[in-house]
Amino acid sequence: MNENEQATRTSGTTERSLPEEVEVAIVGAGPTGLTLAGMLSGYGIRTAVLDGAQGPALHSRAAVVHARTLETLEPLGVVGKMLGGGVVVPHFGVRDRDRLLLRVDFDGLPTTHPYTLMLPQDRTERILLGALHEQGGRVLWEHEAVGIRQDAGGVDLLVRGARGDGRVRARY
């Protein structure tokens, strides 16, 4: 890992201690977990996002962001940054050498985003992580959820962390 990758990787490491209790515990700091945490934090709901990784992903596992996903992300205020860092694709084609087998045009979709956006997932996650930080939320990196106990009042999430085991109590 070079210096830039290390600096980028550790920039996501913002909090190491487990909170005792939160409203919502979220397992995984991928696009879905970060989106949920960002939206809940925007409503003042305290979350704990737990992820066993050392920090944000360094490499992409996906690259396409669909129109409905962009609509969903609008309340977080991240779509402009995503568009600025990606490539808008107004149509999609499948070819067999020189022969076009299928063409899908997105401009007829009933959406404010009649296209797909090509943006590597690691960049998407960094943008979502930035939005979460702006809302006051954090990710607990190097904290892996290893068990759950549920009762009428919520859940106890059993966590294995870099500094030992612990638990987080959450209503949801």
Task: Indicate residue ranges for each PLM-predicted region.
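Core beta-strand elements of the Rossmann-like FAD/NAD(P) dinucleotide-binding domain
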Residues: E20-V22, G164-Y172
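Glycine-rich FAD pyrophosphate-binding loop
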Residues: M39-A62
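Glycine-rich Rossmann-fold phosphate-binding loop(s) that bind the pyrophosphate
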Residues: A29-P31, G52, Q121
